[in-house]
Amino acid sequence: DGKLCLVKGQGEETWALPGGFGEVGYSPTENILKEIQEETGYSARVIRLLAVFDTNRYQLQSRQYVKLVFECELLDGNFEKNQEISDLAFFEREKIPALSTKRNTEEQLNFLWEVYDGKRDLYCD
């Protein structure tokens, strides 16, 4: 429905896209579906890859990571607080709360909206 699912980590005041590290032996699609289930309690369907981000482009880290961001449709389930996530909410693009900039930046979300709206193809750093 065009709203963005964001989560708040335990002990954090800011929000981020759900996600996590990919595990060996899983495809990117399998990994994101696993992470969505673990973090949100929802089952989902991957629609398409929206972006590939180089984490060092946005915040220099001791290790370089590549983030794959997918558009997904949540199918069913219920959110319950867990050891990683304290809250989950769906936001309209004009009402995005303060972001956990170590995980997602406003610039990255703007790229995602451009792809979602069909204003550009897949975004890749």
Which residues does each PLM region occupy?
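Short loop segments at secondary-structure junctions
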Residues: 1-3, 73-78, 93-95
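N-terminal strand-loop-strand
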Residues: 1-17, 44, 48
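Nucleotide phosphate-binding site architecture
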Residues: 5, 23, 97
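Conserved hydrophobic/aromatic beta-strand scaffold that supports enzyme active sites
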Residues: 6, 69-71, 90
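The catalytic Nudix box helix
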Residues: 17-50, 70
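Active-site-adjacent beta-strand/loop module that shapes the phosphate/pyrophosphate-binding cleft
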Residues: 53-78, 112, 116
